[in-house]
Amino acid sequence: MGVTKKPDLTDPVLRAKLAKGMGHNYYGEPAWPNDLLYMFPVVILGTIACNVGLAVLEPSLVGEPANPFATPLEILPEWYFFPVFQILRTVPNKLLGVLLMAAVPAGLLTVPFIENVNKFQNPFRRPVATTVFLIGTVVAIWLGIGATLPIDTSLTLGLF
């Protein structure tokens, strides 16, 4: 077991370095440019090479091949587009549907300006933002579930 030398805290040179914030690792190798210019590109290129190698050597199919002569009865988008699809499907005027879709991010952008006097991070002390979040989540789930149902029961989810 080696003997380590304890630093002499009465040394004025060491005290000056500690006062400047140089108490640890002022003798080491800097992260810039060594790590960022030499090590990170090697890791990134290695990751890309592994991905390309796997794609070339072992290609895998992403679902069934498309058949242009057999279309499904009802075409549904991916699951994350279900609420938007439901808005476009239920609104009779398509321009109004597009405007409703644009109103969602516009409404979310106005929430910080409505509650700009409230600096709290606690959601219970920010009632407007919490209410907008909860109502938006419920409406998005409701529209998403309704998009998977036929058009006549999509708005009521078949409950009424």
Swiss-Prot record:
Entry membrane topology: Multi-pass membrane protein
Single GO cellular component term: chloroplast thylakoid membrane
Presence of the UniProt keyword ATP-binding in the record: no
GO molecular function, one term: ubiquinol-cytochrome-c reductase activity
Pfam families per record: Cytochrom_B_C (PF00032)
Keyword Signal in record: no
Major location category of this protein: plastid
UniProt entry keywords in alphabetical sequence: Chloroplast, Electron transport, Membrane, Photosynthesis, Plastid, Thylakoid, Transmembrane, Transmembrane helix, Transport
GO terms under biological process: mitochondrial electron transport, ubiquinol to cytochrome c; photosynthetic electron transport chain
Listed InterPro entries: Cyt_b/b6_C, Cyt_b/b6_C_sf, Cyt_b6/f_cplx_suIV, Cytochrome_b_C_euk/bac
Segments traversing the membrane: 36-56, 95-115, 131-151
UniProt superkingdom: Eukaryota
Localization in the cell: Plastid, Chloroplast thylakoid membrane
Functional summary from the UniProt entry: Component of the cytochrome b6-f complex, which mediates electron transfer between photosystem II (PSII) and photosystem I (PSI), cyclic electron flow around PSI, and state transitions.
Quaternary structure annotation from Swiss-Prot or TrEMBL: The 4 large subunits of the cytochrome b6-f complex are cytochrome b6, subunit IV (17 kDa polypeptide, petD), cytochrome f and the Rieske protein, while the 4 small subunits are petG, petL, petM and petN. The complex functions as a dimer.
Family of the protein in this entry: Belongs to the cytochrome b family. PetD subfamily.
Name of the protein this chain belongs to: Cytochrome b6-f complex subunit 4
Organism: Coleochaete orbicularis (Charophycean green alga)
Highest classification ranks of the organism: Eukaryota, Viridiplantae, Streptophyta, Coleochaetophyceae, Coleochaetales
Gene: petD
